[in-house]
Regions:
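Anionic-ligand-binding alpha/beta catalytic cores of soluble enzymes and soluble regulatory domains
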Residues: 1-37
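Long, charged alpha-helical interface segments
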Residues: 24-26, 30-143
Length: 144
């Protein structure tokens, strides 16, 4: 269920929306073609911020105001190079992507970020399907 919920965060992001998963001292979110801007924080040293490319390729990735900074980087879903970063005490931070979808995890004591996008998104998530799946295995009780 955890992975499916992360997939849902990416789906929301790809439609110009944002969601936050809270649990076990961490928050997970996603951003597509946009940025997360965190206000000044007071996060304990050693609490991790991690950024992963949900897209096959994410272009123009930037991380500023963190222990390790990058600018205009290309990230892929098959190479882990955005893990175990940290907020700087008292500093604002920025995580952005020009094109692609990033999954971002950060400590729950960090302020929730302001979210911005580079363009508007069209469409919605579609209609709600309430039918029982045809993939459901049906076992009838056998009489004895």
């Amino acid at each position: 269920h955890t992975i499916s919920n992360i997939q849902l965060m990416a789906l929301l992001a790809q439609h110009g929306a944002v969601g936050f998963l809270h649990g076990n001292g961490s928050i997970v979110t996603a951003i597509c073609d946009g940025a997360l801007d965190f206000g000044e924080n007071n996060v304990e040293p050693g609490r991790m911020v991690s950024v992963f490319s949900h897209s096959d390729t994410s272009l123009g990735v930037s991380e500023r105001g963190l222990k390790y900074e990058i600018d205009d980087m290309t990230m892929t879903s098959t190479r882990v190079n955005g893990v175990s970063n940290e907020f700087l005490n008292g500093a604002a931070a920025h995580i952005g992507v020009e094109h692609g979808t990033l999954v971002v995890t950060f400590p729950s004591e960090a302020p929730l970020p302001a979210v911005s996008w580079h363009h508007t998104f069209e469409g919605d998530l579609g209609s709600l399907d309430t039918k029982v799946s045809s993939a459901l295995a049906k076992h009838e009780l056998q009489s004895r």
